[in-house]
Swiss-Prot record, chain A:
It is found in: Cell inner membrane. ATP binds at residues 37-44. Residues 5-237, 249-492 form the ABC transporter domain. GO terms for molecular function: ABC-type D-ribose transporter activity; ATP binding; ATP hydrolysis activity. PROSITE patterns: ABC_TRANSPORTER_1, ABC_TRANSPORTER_2, RBSA. InterPro entries: AAA+_ATPase (IPR003593), ABC_carbohydrate_import_ATPase (IPR050107), ABC_transporter-like_ATP-bd (IPR003439), ABC_transporter-like_CS (IPR017871), P-loop_NTPase (IPR027417). The complex is composed of an ATP-binding protein (RbsA), two transmembrane proteins (RbsC) and a solute-binding protein (RbsB). It holds the Pfam family ABC_tran. It is a peripheral membrane protein. CDD domains: ABC_Carb_Monos_I (cd03216), ABC_Carb_Monos_II (cd03215). Signal peptide: none annotated. Keywords: ATP-binding, Cell inner membrane, Cell membrane, Membrane, Nucleotide-binding, Repeat, Sugar transport, Translocase, Transport. This is Ribose import ATP-binding protein RbsA.
Length: 506, 335
């Protein structure tokens, strides 16, 4: 086998931050090369370079021995490189056939021929999908197949899969892996990015590990165990990241949700969290965790449900009511919902508590500056000062600002939705320490995370959601990835009542 | 690398960073004061072209003419900061103007002006409520208000201009009067500009208006009822438009239903030349004033040098495009 693609000495800097540090990466035709690493390790940036979405600061790309320069995704596609994105990039209102031939529709469309050609490609993949169906009507698994068909129709000779099974059920995932195997046997080069290391061990020929933008190792898959992959990814034993769990008893149940229903993904949820307790919400993407957080916080409308703080019911119609009740939300989408990205650290930090600093509507600047200065020092936000725009911070430090704006305001409950997504390892452990401190100060903490290590490492209890319901509750002795996934995928509720009477020591 | 090369390498790098730093300083200077630089250059050019330009009389005249545009531009600035737009102000101006003229004979001056201003507030309240609570696009809603308000102005007057009678002589006196060399409307305009600057720089309202324009969802999820702020900016804009209408009625002595057609575009142009971003979140009151003055000076120069009216329009359009391109370049270099 020969190298189809060689990336040599790839570097990428975003502002002052190095996202990739001199990374070498090669893919042979007819192999599956897995790329693993934590969130923020640089996988997406490296694949961005390979697919023409990111222009590297330094380094060379060669395809079949010829040096290429990709300045747009179109250049990469022309060189035979296609990427199946995590968020699929299909036009939802167009048909399957139109999407497959999107970028080379003839001026005058022969609809019959278009569908015939599309059907032919889909057949080759072994899937029966109607070329005339509208993309928006297809389930996610089929849309992914359409993406692959599109890549093949472009004569892709290297296909990048970015977390393809994250959104699939087990049987769809198995079919997808089989499809990838058959593509491999046809001589297609494949880059496979996944957090599911069992899949990686199953399908990959070679494994490359990135950590914090650097290449850690490239190994033959058969020579490396899953445990070893984890150690290479994290760079230190996992347990050291999370700190010590609480051993003293929790306080009273200060936060309770009763029969919360809001749309199809939040169905009749009831649970409580005690003071000082960190409760995890686990489950697959799309199981309703984010929707639950938003419904509690009043960010989305809810159909029914009561929320209790300190035993008495509070009326929450919008986020303002939630804030008044002492509830804070660190949203999933940091840039879109967590921060005003072009405003300064100072403005973002005091946004939740502006009234304190402006008794008559006029902001007391000195007071505000002192407050923010102390806050960012306590949270170890690395910045050029409190007037630096949040944009200039790394992801981890941006997240600390988002948490910082809630520290004083969310005096009772803080809900964190994927707080360490896209955050480097160093900042991660700092954020974990902050979360622990928030709980130790007597708050009820609700933590949503798709990172199972994180859930198990931080939480005192994990509620597993699946299709809008709580499917199971796991206690520390039961923390097990397989258990969590199978509970989330269960169709029938395993358990809808939730225990709250046990002690953490137990 | 030999040690010597190393040192040289290090030095040249240090020089580069220093240059880079100076470059950034220069750019942040032009971003802050870019409009001011254009303004100063224009004043110099105008003074060179016409010896009449820098006379006290011409300057005060220019300021008085620009005062209504500036007053409305301050209102528009608040709207634009929230990523909105208010196309109705030219028509709301007419409503304010005709109400003041209509009611003055019977109700007296203070009451008629108050009613005119309240009418402006109501127009803004209607637009703001629809935009904030029903999430309708500002462009469409204020476009609708533009025709509704214009129609109302014609209905109120029966299509005829209303002459100000003697009961309203105080208004004419105010709009045409001076304190020393400074016309009253210019003083009023200055007070509004200062107030606008203060609100945007030192109050939580101003800060949140800008933040909403940058990322409304983040502000909402911080526990702020963003809709109220959005309603408020349209109310401010409506109020300023009605105030401008009252002033124009005073200055011309007529409440005319067809006054102010197209003013909204002039005002938006002033705001944009002043460096405010139509994408929200960025802009300030003083630069908006400069934006309005730049337009006024260009008009004034062309008048002084006898450029025909139609040609003036073409040149104005070109100036707006040039100003926006300039800002775009500055912003790209900044990021």
């Amino acid at each position: 086998m020969t190298d189809f693609v060689q990336l040599i000495g790839i570097e990428k800097h975003f502002g002052g931050i190095a996202a990739l540090k001199s990374v070498d990466f090669t893919v042979k035709s007819g192999e599956v090369h897995a790329l693993i690493g934590e969130n923020g390790a640089g996988k997406s940036t490296l694949m961005g370079v390979l697919s023409g979405n990111v222009i590297p600061t330094a380094g060379t790309i060669s395809v079949e021995g010829c040096v290429r320069r990709f300045s747009t995704p179109g250049d990469a596609i022309a060189a035979g490189i296609a990427m199946i994105h995590q968020e699929l990039v299909l036009a939802p209102d167009l048909t399957v056939a139109e999407n497959i031939f999107m970028n080379r529709m003839p001026r005058l469309i022969d609809w019959a021929k278009l569908r015939r050609d599309a059907a032919q490609i889909l057949d080759r993949l072994g899937f029966e999908i109607d070329p005339g169906a509208t993309i928006g009507d297809l389930p996610l698994a089929q849309r992914q197949i359409v993406e692959i068909a599109k890549a093949l129709s472009l004569n892709a000779r290297l296909i990048i899969f970015d977390e393809p099974t994250a959104v699939l059920g087990p049987s769809d995932a198995r079919r997808l892996l089989n499809l990838i195997r058959s593509l491999r046997s046809e001589g297609v080069a494949i880059v496979y990015i996944s957090h599911r290391l069992d899949e990686v061990a199953d399908i990959a020929d070679r494994v490359t590990v990135l950590n914090d933008g650097s290449l850690i190792a490239t190994r033959a898959a058969k020579d490396v165990t899953i445990e070893e992959m984890v150690r290479l990814m994290v760079g230190r034993p996992i347990s050291a990241l999370f700190g010590e769990k609480r051993t003293s008893p929790f306080g009273a149940e200060i936060f309770r949700v009763e029969s919360l229903t809001a749309g199809p993904l939040v169905q009749d949820l009831s649970f409580g969290v005690r003071a000082g307790e960190i409760v995890g919400l686990g489950g697959l993407i799309g199981s309703g965790r984010t929707e639950t957080a938003r419904a509690i916080f009043g960010a989305d409308k809810r159909e029914s449900g009561r929320i209790f703080i300190d035993g008495s019911q509070v009326k929450i119609r919008d986020p303002r009511d939630a804030v008044k009740a002492g509830i804070g939300l660190v949203p999933e989408d940091r840039r879109g919902q967590g921060v005003v990205i072009d405003a300064s650290i100072r403005i973002n930090t005091t946004m939740t508590s502006l009234r304190r600093f402006s008794p008559a509507g006029i902001i007391k600047r000195t007071f505000e500056r002192r407050f923010v200065g102390e806050k960012i020092a306590a949270l170890k936000v690395k910045s050029a000062g409190i007037d630096a725009p949040v944009q200039s911070l790394s992801g981890g430090n941006q997240q600390k600002v988002v948490i910082g704006k809630w520290v004083d305001v969310a005096s009772k409950v803080i809900i964190l939705d994927e707080p360490t997504r896209g955050v480097d390892v160093g900042a991660k452990s700092e954020i974990y320490a902050i979360i622990r401190r928030l709980a130790d100060e007597g708050r009820a903490v609700l933590l949503i995370s798709s990172d199972h290590q994180e859930l198990f490492g931080l939480c005192d209890r994990v509620l597993v959601m699946g299709r809008g319901r709580i499917r199971s509750e796991l206690l520390p002795g039961e923390f097990d990835e397989e258990r969590l996934l199978s509970a989330s995928l269960a169709i029938e509720p395993i358990q809808t009542t939730v225990r709250t009477d046990q002690n953490p020591a137990g | 690398m030999t040690p010597l090369q190393n040192v040289q390498h290090f030095r040249s790098n240090a020089i580069k960073t220093e240059r880079h730093r100076q470059g950034v300083k220069f750019l942040s200077f032009t971003r802050r004061y870019g409009t001011l630089v254009i303004f100063v250059l224009l004043v110099a050019a105008a003074a060179y072209i016409s010896t009449d330009f820098l006379t006290l009389r011409n300057v005060m005249n220019l300021l008085r003419q620009a005062s209504t545009t500036i007053i409305m531009a301050i209102g528009m600035l608040f709207v634009v900061l929230t990523r909105g737009i208010d196309l109705s102000i030219g028509s709301v101006l007419a409503v304010g103007g005709v109400i003041a003229a209509l009611l003055a004979p019977e109700w007296g001056l203070p009451a008629s002006i108050a009613v005119a201003l309240v009418a402006g507030l109501i127009c803004g309240l209607a637009c703001g409520t629809l935009i904030a609570y029903l999430r309708l696009p500002p462009f469409v809603i204020t476009l609708a208000m533009m025709t509704v308000a214009r129609g109302s102005a014609f209905i109120l007057t029966g299509g005829q201009p209303i002459m100000l009678n003697d009961a309203a002589s105080g208004l004419s006196a105010f709009a045409g009067g001076y304190i020393g060399p400074v016309p009253y409307p210019v003083l009023l305009m200055a007070a509004i500009v200062l107030l606008g600057t203060f609100v945007l720089m030192f109050t939580s309202f101003g800060r949140l208006v800008k933040a909403i324009g940058s990322n409304e969802e983040a502000v909402r999820l911080s526990g702020i009822r963003t809709q109220r702020y959005i309603v408020a900016v349209y109310v401010i804009s409506g109020f300023m438009a009605a105030l401008a209408g009252v002033l124009i009625t005073g200055r011309t002595g007529v409440g005319a239903p067809n006054v102010g057609v197209g003013f909204e575009l002039q005002v938006i142009a002033a705001v944009v030349i002043g460096g405010a971003s139509l994408m929200g979140g960025r802009g300030d009151a003083l630069n908006t004033v400069l934006g309005a003055l730049i337009l006024a000076i260009i008009g004034n120069i062309m008048n002084l040098s006898n450029v025909p009216g139609y040609t003036q329009q073409v040149i104005m359009g070109a100036v707006i495009v040039a100003a926006v391109i300039l800002q775009k370049i500055q912003n790209q270099k900044m990021s």
